[in-house]
Amino acid sequence: MTRCDLCNETHQSHLPTLRQLYEEAFPLSERRPWSDLEQLIGAQGAYHFFLLEHPELGVVGFVTLWRFDDFYYGEHFAILPQLRNHRLGEQTLQTIREYIGHAPLYFEVEPETHSEMAGRRINYYERNGFHIVKRDYLQPPYHHDESGVPLYIMSSEQGERDFIERVCQTLVEQVYPHF
């Protein structure tokens, strides 16, 4: 099976497809405004927007990663709907793990009580070696007129409680906007 590659050069021609995927895959409360995302894409620093490319299929999705001193945070990860259930996500997680080395990787996910899809997403991450490490996490709002969103934190490592609390504090302070 051919794997997907991470491409950190997002060509302008791909942005309409990626924007549509971003806006369809994530509810408004779990995504920043597209204009803010475009600013992050062009900036240097901890934020990385990776186009997911397959040699035979072309662009299949994207993943956004934040690189911190001793861990990575996957803010958004989506595969085009027509290409889901073909193990592309699994291949992408493997590619991400190769890219980040031994650093722990964290994702936020909706609780399984939110929807059937949320439960399937948790199962997907668990099948790929992730564990729920925090169930009482409140994602700060992306928009000034909204409240935080209750989510779980999943990790590629079990981690010590103090480290997980520091991860959550880093996300609150450095990833989300402050109003």
Task: Give the label of every model feature segment.
Residues 100-116, 122:
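Conserved GNAT acetyl-CoA-binding A-motif
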Residues 79, 85-99:
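Conserved acetyl-CoA-binding loop-helix of GNAT-fold acetyltransferases
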Residues 153-159:
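Conserved beta strand-loop-helix elements of the APE1-like EEP
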Residues 51, 57-66, 71-78:
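Conserved beta-strand in the GNAT
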Residues 41-51, 147:
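A short helix-loop-beta-strand connector motif used in the catalytic cores of GNAT acetyltransferases and
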Residues 1-36, 53, 151, 163-179:
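Short amphipathic alpha-helix that is part of the acyltransferase structural core
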Residues 108, 121-146:
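Conserved catalytic-core motifs of GNAT/GCN5-like acyltransferases
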